[in-house]
Amino acid sequence: MTLFSSISSISNPMTSSKSSISSFGSGTSMGSNSIACGGCGGSGGILGLGLGLGLGLDLTGGSRSRGACGGNGGNRGNGNGGMGGGKSPCCGGCCCGI
């Protein structure tokens, strides 16, 4: 049981770490996603940095997108994750529409 707790503790921080790393390096990765969604531009890359990583970092990505979009990213990683279900991106003028 103790071992399990330790593993959980280690797992948790790792996720947080990944979130941070993703937020930083995802901007570049998001470039492809942004372009695929219609090329939002620089801001799109920053907004979608966490969104594209919807694989579980939707928490970070959602927060970022909502903050930058003005709180209209209710569907952070709802379907595509990459673009918050096509609703968050519409805030920055780059509607994914996927």
UniProtKB/Swiss-Prot annotation:
InterPro entries according to UniProt: HssA/B-like_chaperone, HssA/B-related
Annotated signal sequence range: none
Region described as Disordered: spans on this chain: 1-29
Alphabetized Pfam families for the sequence: Coiled
GO biological process, one term: sorocarp development
Entry similarity comment: Belongs to the hssA/B family.
PANTHER family (alphabetical): HSSA/B-LIKE PROTEIN 1-RELATED-RELATED, HSSA_B-LIKE PROTEIN 1-RELATED
Annotated protein name in UniProt: HssA/B-like protein 36
Recorded name of the encoding gene: hssl36
